[in-house]
């Protein structure tokens, strides 16, 4: 099985400007993500950016860059442009890895690609069991429920499924563990163009979850439990400092 990893890396960030180039132990953040993707065994790793500063930094460490439009409204639109510009075949597997996850385990990058390869779905993703009571009711921890074959039934910021009897007894964490969605996706390349040409659905607007568009239009997303739970990504200066400390401790 061969697959390509695309890493969107926008320079502008409201809470952390210049995020892809943030220094972590002497390397820009985007290089850490790139190296994790290489370790996953990807055939090709492409960094998609709309900023020359990011492109220049990637050239320094020998990565591959695809310059994209600054006008995309979503990461998936940027992904579709990469597929078109790089001439990626319709049946090829493309994994979208966020550019702000320098500690993402290579094992789950490969796992989501293998998940899609073993499925008839056009798209695959991963989840982890929720083990924290805070996460159960946290709208930023997106939940996913699946059918018996592992295909997503719904994604929500709400607490799903709602364990009526357990919650009535005051039991939040039960043996019927909820699953938190991890924002890593594998696509069949030809499906990406189909996806971005669909009009946004009412459900995705309500939940602010773009993946609901796929279910709305009757397509499937296969979900597996991740082999490893990835550390949190970098959204704020505080997150960045935490990642720096983790990497410093490892070295």
From Swiss-Prot:
**Gene Ontology molecular function:** 3-deoxy-manno-octulosonate cytidylyltransferase activity
Concerning SUPFAM superfamilies, the annotation shows: Nucleotide-diphospho-sugar transferases (SSF53448)
Pathway(s) per entry = Nucleotide-sugar biosynthesis; CMP-3-deoxy-D-manno-octulosonate biosynthesis; CMP-3-deoxy-D-manno-octulosonate from 3-deoxy-D-manno-octulosonate and CTP: step 1/1; Bacterial outer membrane biogenesis; lipopolysaccharide biosynthesis
Q: Name one GO cellular component term.
A: cytosol
Q: Which reaction does it catalyse?
A: 3-deoxy-alpha-D-manno-oct-2-ulosonate + CTP = CMP-3-deoxy-beta-D-manno-octulosonate + diphosphate
Keywords carried by this UniProt record: Cytoplasm, Lipopolysaccharide biosynthesis, Nucleotidyltransferase, Transferase
Key word Nucleotidyltransferase present in the record? yes
Can you tell which superkingdom this protein's organism belongs to? Answer: Bacteria
Q: Which InterPro entries match?
A: Cytidylyl_trans (IPR003329), KdsB (IPR004528), Nucleotide-diphossugar_trans (IPR029044)
Instruction: Give compartment(s).
Output: Cytoplasm
Q: What is its EC number?
A: 2.7.7.38
| Pfam families noted in UniProt | CTP_transf_3
Which interval of the chain is the signal sequence? none
Task: Please indicate if the UniProt record lists Nucleotidyltransferase as a keyword.
Answer: yes
GO biological process assignments: CMP-keto-3-deoxy-D-manno-octulosonic acid biosynthetic process; lipopolysaccharide biosynthetic process
Function, as annotated, reads: Activates KDO (a required 8-carbon sugar) for incorporation into bacterial lipopolysaccharide in Gram-negative bacteria.
Q: Which family does it belong to?
A: Belongs to the KdsB family.
The molecule here is called 3-deoxy-manno-octulosonate cytidylyltransferase
Q: Which gene encodes it?
A: kdsB
